[in-house]
Structures are given as structure tokens and as C-alpha cells.
Curated annotation (Swiss-Prot):
Any one of the GO CC terms: plasma membrane
Keywords attached to this entry: Auxin signaling pathway, Cell membrane, Developmental protein, Growth regulation, Membrane
Native source organism of the sequence: Arabidopsis thaliana (Mouse-ear cress)
Gene behind the chain: SAUR61
Purpose of the protein: May promote auxin-stimulated organ elongation, such as hypocotyls, stamen filaments and petals.
Similarity remark: Belongs to the ARG7 family.
Protein name, per record: Auxin-responsive protein SAUR61
Lineage of the organism: Eukaryota, Viridiplantae, Streptophyta, Embryophyta, Tracheophyta
């Protein structure tokens, strides 16, 4: 398990890299979509799923081993993003299911089984996709 300082350092590095390129990222929005933002709220980090749904997590989730595994899988699949957001190779339904399991505070054996299951059943995506015209954000607390 990674220590908290290392996790915060990794998250800060990803946020800094995304911030360097944020001005170049163009999100196509319709005129009626004004509430979604490209920047994360204070104390949160943002990830996108393979179906281009935006999730905002509190920074405290970085200490959870399931979330750590999701970020490792994302890094293996897509690398550390330099010109875009962190994308997870899972759809939003699967991520919502994982979030519910994480919120239940699983015991160690269940958590290990879940991590093994995630690692063995992940899907592959083409690395070059663009965000759709609509984007929705889901806050997780």
C-alpha cells in the first residue's frame, strides 16, 4: 500500500500536468450546459470513465487501495495524461458500483478480492478519443 504523502504527491503531479495543458483542452458545450466546469472543486480530483462521464472524488479517496488500483490501471492503459484528463478504462456504471463498495468500508479480504477482480477483468480502449458535446459531473461524498 502506498503512503499518503506519496499519493498526494502523485495526485498533485497529475493535477499540475493537467493544469499546464488545461487551456488547450476544449470541451464542447451546448448553450444550456453552464453548471459543469473543467476545474475540480477544492479538495477534489476528477477522473473520466470510458463513456466520458466525469466523476469528482474527495482527495481522501486517494488513500483507498481500490482507488489506487484504478489509477494504476489508468496509468498502465493510457499513461500519465499530459494533454487531457485522467481517464479510467471502465464505464460509469462499473465505477458507480465500485464507489458504493468503497463507501461500505469493506474488510481486507473483500478489498483484495475486488482489486484482483478489477485487474483481471478490465477492458481496453483506443487511446485517442474525444469528449462528447455533453459532459456530466458526478460528485462522490
Amino acid at each position: 500500500m502506498m503512503n499518503t504523502k506519496k499519493l498526494l504527491k502523485m495526485a498533485k503531479k497529475w493535477q499540475q500536468r493537467a493544469a499546464l495543458r488545461r487551456k488547450r483542452i476544449s470541451f464542447h458545450r451546448s448553450t444550456d450546459t453552464t453548471s459543469s466546469s473543467t476545474a475540480a472543486e477544492k479538495g477534489c480530483f476528477v477522473v473520466y470513465t470510458s463513456d466520458r462521464i466525469r466523476f469528482a472524488f474527495p482527495i481522501s479517496y486517494l488513500s483507498n487501495s481500490v482507488i489506487q488500483e484504478l489509477l494504476k490501471i489508468s496509468e498502465e492503459e493510457f499513461g500519465i495524461p499530459t494533454e487531457g484528463p485522467i481517464t479510467l478504462p471502465f464505464d460509469s456504471v462499473f465505477l458507480e458500483y465500485l464507489i458504493r463498495l468503497v463507501q461500505r468500508r469493506m474488510d481486507g479480504d473483500t478489498e483484495k478480492a475486488l482489486i484482483t477482480s478489477i485487474s483481471s477483468t478490465r477492458c481496453s480502449l483506443p487511446c485517442s478519443f474525444q469528449l462528447q458535446e455533453h459532459s456530466s459531473t458526478r460528485l462522490v461524498f
